[in-house]
Structure formats: structure tokens, C-alpha cells
């Protein structure tokens, strides 16, 4: 596990994250997979070793004291006395063998270097979205993965959400693509959580628009493709907090159907939302020539109200944190859990000679089939940096994406 923050451990700025992931996702899932005998040795690499005593104490409170029979042991890099070592992950990777698995949840601008190092060592790799920030990095990583014959995929749990899976399958029956609109937001507190990189090395579009850009590419990719991107941004609230970031970013993307007709997509993401009943508002509308689909992922018809937390809309379909009557973790059916489980099972099958990395193209969000997602996000950033100028996605005669052009 490379990265020690909110998604891995739920530990942010010395305490549990002020979000729906206070117990983390990655480490908890790996502890449970180890209980089942599906992973063995666990290592965790960060850049600040002095955080690890706090991380271990936090995990004991939110995992060890909550669930029965979970071993929380892991090896950490760098040492607990090392305040700063951004390359500690290299020493952790050197402890691994070809065929081992690496999960990366770090700031977006670090993904490519970490991924390249893992692939070079022959490890199978799952990287937080966006898998990388630049199209040329994505194509280089794809080539390296195929040369080393390893599995490289993007962690995109929405591909396991039963509502999104069903919508994707139905969208393919709705004829040519016409219009797509998505919105995803998180509260202003996330600006403090991600203060170290927000607006400096990445933005809210990379962080949140990645979800629905990938979903749309996954759903419509068999009959349409993105061809032009323009971006616009709203500013002011983040800057008032001393953070040099856009508040809200919207990508306007032209799509071309195989039939020659055109479609339009609008992806909007924001991290200046007020605190509300959910940590993330997230919804989309899709229109095809023969029908439409509307999904409100934030509201599943299940609400809770407590003295401690007030009114909230719950989504145990993502991660079920409440233990069962025997005190055991029973979140194995959550789509947040299953995206890691299926990657680990794939790595195990490849290691056992039962499958090859190419067998998972179309089954996982592999580096081979997420090129468009990276290209749209990269083009959006280029457009923003060019005062909203359009950026074209360039394809060769065989329909393969080869570059971007302002």
C-alpha cells in the first residue's frame, strides 16, 4: 500500500477523517483479505514516518476495537523517526517480488513515478483515479505494462456499484449517444484535507470528474468516442482559504458516434459544497437516441439521524462499516471493497498461471481501456490553462487515440 491518507487509513491531520471514510478503505479491506488468506505480508509506504504511531493508534480505535479477528500488523516505510522521505516507497517496493500486488493512493502528480517503479519490478498494480495525469504518461505506462506482462488498472469502484453497472448495460441499448450531464461535489473541509496539493499539483476535475468521465467512457465506449474538450472554472472560495485552486470545474466534451452523429457531455465537480446529508453529492443524466437514464448515487432511500451526527443519507452499498451481531466486519459485498478484492483475485490468478493480464481487459479498469479517461482529464486541464481553448483528441486511422492538440 503506497499512501497513508484518507482512503488508505482514514487518518488525516492527526485524527479520523471528517468524511464517510474515517476508518479508511484500503487498509481495512487488506486486513480482511488477509484474514481470508488471500493476501499475506502487508507493507505501507508514506513520506512521513512520524505519522505511523498515530496511524496505528487510529487503526486500533476504528478497526481493531470495532471488529473481531482482524490482524492490523503491517510493515511501514520510512521508519517512525523519519520526518520526510518521499522515496520511501522505493524501499518498500524493493521488499516485494515479481507478481506481488501494489495499491497506490497518493497525490495525483506522484502516480506515474510510483507506477513506473512498480511495473519495472514486475508487480501488478492498482492506482487511484486518475491513474496518471497526462496522456503521454498513460501511453508510456501502458507500453511498460505490456512489456513486463503485468496487470495495471485504475481503482474505480463505480464499476462495481450495482446501479451504475445496470445503467451501463442499459445504456448500450439506448441507441446513439446524445447528451450526458454529471455532477459530483464534496464539502469545503476537503480543501483542508488536501491542502498539501489542492491547486498546486492537481485539481478538483482530476479528483472528482474522473468518476463520471470514466463511467461515460465505459458505458458508451463501444459505439462513441470523445473528440473535443473545453473547460471552464469558478473561483473564489478556495482562494479565500489561502488555497490556489479552482472551486468548481466543468468540462464540455464533444463526442462522435460511430454512425457519424454527435453527442455532448458536461462533467462538473466541486469541492466547496456545504456540509449536508452526504459527503459526496453525485448524480448523472444520460440521454440516448432511444431512451434516457437518471441516477442519484448519493441517495439510496436510506436515511439515519443521530444525536452525534444529525441527519444523513447512508450508503452501505459502498462500504458497510457497522459490525454484525458477532462483532465481525461484514462489508465484503460493498463496491468499495469489491474493487480491491477483484484486483487481488486477478493478481493471484495470474500468479497461479490460471490467467494472463490481457484477460482482464474489459473486466477491470485496465490501463489499456482507461486511455480516454486520462485524455479527457488532461485535455480539460490544458483547456483551463489556455483560457478555455478547445483541445482535440487525435485518433489514428484505426481509431486509436494517439495525442492531444490545442
Task: Enumerate the language-model features and the residues they cover.
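Terminal low-complexity tails and localization/encapsulation signals of metabolic enzymes
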Residues: 1-10, 75-80, 321, 343-346, ...
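N-terminal glycine-/serine-/threonine-rich beta1-alpha1-beta2 phosphate-ribose binding loop
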Residues: 1-121, 139, 143-148
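Predominantly a Rossmann-like dinucleotide-binding segment in NAD(P)-dependent oxidoreductases
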Residues: 5, 151-153, 158-246, 251, ...
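Glycine- and charged-residue-rich phosphate/anionic-cofactor binding loop of Rossmann-like
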Residues: 40, 353-373
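Short helix/strand-capping hinge loops at secondary-structure junctions
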Residues: 122, 128-130
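Hydrophobic residues in well-ordered beta-strands that form the structural core
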Residues: 127-128, 152-154, 295
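Conserved PLP phosphate-binding loop immediately N-terminal to the Schiff-base lysine helix
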Residues: 131-136, 160-162
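Contiguous beta-strand/loop segments that form the cofactor/metal-binding neighborhood of enzyme cores
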Residues: 207-309, 329-332, 336-355, 377-381, ...
Amino acid at each position: 500500500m503506497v499512501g497513508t491518507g484518507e482512503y488508505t487509513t482514514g487518518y488525516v491531520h492527526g485524527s479520523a477523517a471528517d468524511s464517510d471514510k474515517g476508518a479508511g478503505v484500503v487498509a481495512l479491506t487488506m486486513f480482511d483479505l488477509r484474514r481470508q488468506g488471500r493476501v499475506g505480508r502487508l507493507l505501507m509506504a508514506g513520506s512521513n514516518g512520524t505519522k505511523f504511531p498515530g496511524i496505528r493508534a487510529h487503526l486500533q480505535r476504528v478497526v481493531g476495537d470495532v471488529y473481531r479477528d482482524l490482524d492490523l500488523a503491517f510493515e511501514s516505510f520510512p521508519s517512525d523517526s523519519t520526518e520526510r522521505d518521499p522515496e520511501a516507497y522505493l524501499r518498500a517496493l524493493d521488499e516485494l517480488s515479481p507478481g506481488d500486488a501494489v495499491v497506490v493512493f497518493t497525490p495525483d502528480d506522484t502516480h506515474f513515478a510510483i507506477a513506473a517503479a512498480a511495473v519495472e519490478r514486475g508487480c501488478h498494480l492498482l492506482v487511484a483515479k486518475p491513474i496518471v495525469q497526462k496522456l503521454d504518461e498513460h501511453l508510456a505506462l501502458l507500453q511498460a505494462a505490456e512489456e513486463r506482462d503485468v496487470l495495471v488498472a485504475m481503482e474505480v469502484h463505480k464499476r462495481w456499484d450495482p446501479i451504475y453497472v445496470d445503467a451501463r448495460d442499459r445504456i448500450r441499448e439506448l441507441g446513439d449517444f446524445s447528451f450526458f450531464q454529471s455532477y459530483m461535489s464534496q464539502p469545503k473541509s476537503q480543501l483542508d484535507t488536501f491542502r498539501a496539493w489542492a491547486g498546486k499539483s492537481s485539481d478538483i476535475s482530476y479528483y472528482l470528474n474522473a468518476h463520471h468521465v470514466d463511467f461515460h467512457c465505459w458505458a458508451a465506449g463501444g459505439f462513441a468516442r470523445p473528440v473535443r474538450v473545453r473547460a471552464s472554472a469558478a473561483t473564489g472560495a478556495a482562494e479565500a482559504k489561502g488555497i490556489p485552486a479552482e472551486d468548481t470545474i466543468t468540462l464540455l466534451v464533444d463526442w462522435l458516434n460511430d454512425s457519424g452523429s454527435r453527442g455532448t457531455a458536461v462533467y462538473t465537480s466541486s469541492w466547496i459544497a456545504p456540509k449536508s446529508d452526504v459527503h459526496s453529492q453525485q448524480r448523472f443524466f444520460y440521454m440516448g437516441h432511444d431512451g434516457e437514464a437518471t441516477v442519484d448515487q448519493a441517495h439510496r432511500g436510506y436515511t439515519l439521524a443521530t444525536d452525534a451526527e444529525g441527519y444523513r443519507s447512508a450508503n452501505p452499498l459502498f462500504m458497510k462499516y457497522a459490525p454484525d451481531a458477532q462483532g465481525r466486519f461484514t462489508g465484503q459485498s460493498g463496491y468499495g471493497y469489491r474493487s480491491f478484492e477483484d484486483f487481488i483475485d486477478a493478481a493471484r490468478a495470474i500468479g497461479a498461471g490460471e490467467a494472463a493480464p490481457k484477460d482482464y481487459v474489459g473486466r477491470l479498469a485496465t490501463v489499456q481501456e482507461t486511455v480516454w479517461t486520462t485524455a479527457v482529464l488532461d485535455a480539460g486541464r490544458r483547456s483551463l490553462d489556455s483560457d478555455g481553448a478547445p483541445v482535440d483528441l487525435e485518433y489514428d486511422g484505426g481509431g486509436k487515440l494517439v495525442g492531444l492538440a490545442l
